[in-house]
């Protein structure tokens, strides 16, 4: 972690907006380029929060006395906080239940019950327990996370009719309209190929765009297995859902991680614990070896 990254103020992830009323092939690259500026700010903070939870917690102080004795002890309470929340609040994966015993007029109550049961069975077929745990981890640590819902291309009899994928927040985000409704207007997921180029998948209500390096549309690009990345030659597909099928979840209204507000206290605890160890070591050497 660089000195600049250490001094970042963590106040939650930025929500990305656009003033564009309708995203089309003519302006999608421009909208993506502007949104990526804010996403990169979020991405830096997300990466640092994930590393912090894993134990990458540099001490924010320089030892000026007895530099030869510099024990750095990391308590990593951030990991303990995260594990508690994952176990306490996310111990069981999400399931659908009927809100009440009231049914729409003219409907068959057994049909609604069967539909909810069927939907839960499909979720189980999609291994939702592990996917919800991954969603929970990113939500609790980073404050935001996206999931992709897509049509399963070749479902088996025991499979769900849909794919549900938890996306890494380092490589995904959602853009919202800047009006009072804050409607999601485009979902973005991207990856890097073996040549270092970034391939963006941008989903709007009516289209799916494949864009390379925020410069041009992918045109018939194929993977090493010979499969086309897109189903069309110009990098544009029709969105069969009719709406953005990348959904962004927020842990809290300020989009912060579970331990983000206590970062200063956690850093102070690491310094206190390290200085205590240094004090014991220095006192021991002074008493037993004459401070040699």
Feature locations, PLM:
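Extended, regular secondary-structure scaffolds
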Residues: 120, 129, 133-255
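Residue-identity detector for threonine
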Residues: 18, 24, 44, 82, ...
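Intrinsically disordered regions, especially transient/low-confidence alpha-helical propensity segments
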Residues: 82, 87, 206, 246, ...
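Intrinsic disorder/low-complexity segments enriched in polar/small residues
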Residues: 4-6, 10, 31, 41, ...
């Amino acid at each position: 972690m660089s000195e600049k990254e250490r001094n970042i103020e963590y106040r939650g992830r930025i929500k990305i907006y656009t003033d564009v009323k309708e995203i089309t092939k003519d302006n999608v690259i421009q909208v993506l380029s502007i949104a990526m500026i804010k996403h990169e700010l979020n991405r830096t903070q997300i990466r640092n929060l994930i590393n912090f939870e894993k134990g990458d917690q540099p001490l924010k102080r320089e030892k000026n006395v007895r530099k030869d004795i510099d024990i750095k002890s990391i308590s990593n309470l951030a990991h303990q906080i995260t594990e508690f929340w994952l176990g306490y609040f996310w111990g069981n994966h999400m399931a659908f239940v009927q809100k009440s015993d009231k049914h729409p007029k003219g409907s068959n109550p057994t049909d609604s019950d069967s539909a909810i049961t069927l939907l839960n069975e499909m979720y189980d077929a999609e291994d939702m327990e592990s996917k919800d745990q991954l969603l929970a981890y990113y939500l609790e640590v980073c404050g935001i996370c996206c999931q992709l819902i897509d049509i399963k291309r070749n479902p088996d009899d025991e499979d769900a009719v849909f794919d549900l994928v938890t996306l890494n927040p380092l490589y995904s985000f959602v853009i919202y309209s800047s009006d009072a409704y804050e409607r999601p207007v485009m979902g973005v997921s991207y990856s890097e190929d073996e040549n270092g180029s970034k391939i963006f998948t941008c989903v709007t209500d009516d289209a799916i765009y494949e864009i390379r390096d925020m410069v041009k549309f992918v045109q018939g690009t194929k993977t090493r297995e010979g499969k086309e990345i897109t189903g069309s030659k110009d990098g544009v597909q029709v969105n069969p859902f009719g709406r953005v099928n990348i959904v962004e979840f927020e842990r809290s209204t300020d989009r912060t991680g579970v331990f983000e507000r206590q970062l200063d206290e956690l850093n102070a605890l690491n310094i206190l614990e390290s200085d205590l160890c240094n004090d014991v070591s220095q006192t021991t050497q002074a008493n037993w070896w004459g401070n040699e």
